[in-house]
Amino acid sequence: MKPVTLSTLNRYKQEKKKFATITAYDASFARLFANEGIPAMLIGDSLGMTLQGHDSTLPVTVEQIAYHTRCVRAGAPNAFLIADMPFMSYSTPEQACLNAAILMQAGANMVKIEGGSWLIPTVKMLTERAVPVCIHLGLTPQSVNVFGGYKVQGREEAAAEQLKQDAMALEAAGAQLAVLECVPVSVAKTITGSLNIPVIGIGAGNVTDGQILVMHDLLGLTPNAPKFSKNFLQEAGSLPEAVRLYVQQVEQKLFPQEQHSFN
């Protein structure tokens, strides 16, 4: 695989080429994902649930994300790596810069932060200091205690409009990628069409520029897997074939389908 950059992902959006991304936490799986055509990987704070066994992402630390970023970079030297900034690691712009530096030095190409327009000063400060930023809107797992659980966001007209306004404001502040999680397909379509930056969806239908799944969901390892996930290993005969099938179905708009989406 040739080195994947932000320019690569931007070109995919311009060419309307759907692309598949995935969470990764170690060198072996990262190598497998890269070999099967995954251009970008997220070192997600989801590791708090998938690897550590917690019931939320809140206990994850910056040091843990940095450790797993180094592991993934070793296995996928040419992939575009997005590192999650954990809970309360970016509560001020200054704190965000210090913690983002740790993740970038560990091998990340970009950091991801969850939230709305309150993040504008943080996005500006990070991008002014050469740290590319991915924003995460909709269901933001670090806010699970505020939401009262993992619930679909943006179903009401006012909430949907707020998501769109937040996304546009954060793009204007310098964000270069967006993740939309658990929002109605109509909302995802509007936001994706309103932004110039690539939008990656999870539980947002097949109208976004790219898709992402937690690797454990894709491989059928998650008990009570979320509606938006699919066990690709069930249809495939091996791990590489499962990943290849995921990539193909995303590129051909065969995944996600209506049963994986919200209205």
UniProtKB/Swiss-Prot annotation:
Q: Which residues bind 3-methyl-2-oxobutanoate?
A: 45-46, 84, 112
Q: Which cysteines are joined by disulfide bonds?
A: none
Cofactors named for this entry: Mg(2+)
Root EC class: transferase
For this record, an example GO cellular component is: cytoplasm
GO BP term, pick one: pantothenate biosynthetic process
Q: How is the cofactor bound?
A: Binds 1 Mg(2+) ion per subunit.
Assigned keywords, A-Z: Cytoplasm, Magnesium, Metal-binding, Pantothenate biosynthesis, Transferase
Q: In which pathway does it act?
A: Cofactor biosynthesis; (R)-pantothenate biosynthesis; (R)-pantoate from 3-methyl-2-oxobutanoate: step 1/2
Reactions performed catalytically: 3-methyl-2-oxobutanoate + (6R)-5,10-methylene-5,6,7,8-tetrahydrofolate + H2O = 2-dehydropantoate + (6S)-5,6,7,8-tetrahydrofolate
* Gene Ontology molecular functions: 3-methyl-2-oxobutanoate hydroxymethyltransferase activity; magnesium ion binding
Could you say which residues bind Mg(2+) here? 45, 84, 114
EC code:
2.1.2.11
Localization, per the record, is: Cytoplasm
Q: Enumerate the active-site residues.
A: 181 (proton acceptor)
Name the Pfam families for this protein: Pantoate_transf
Report TM segments: none
**Known partners and oligomeric status:** Homodecamer; pentamer of dimers.
The similarity annotation says: Belongs to the PanB family.
Record function comment: Catalyzes the reversible reaction in which hydroxymethyl group from 5,10-methylenetetrahydrofolate is transferred onto alpha-ketoisovalerate to form ketopantoate.
Descriptive protein name: 3-methyl-2-oxobutanoate hydroxymethyltransferase
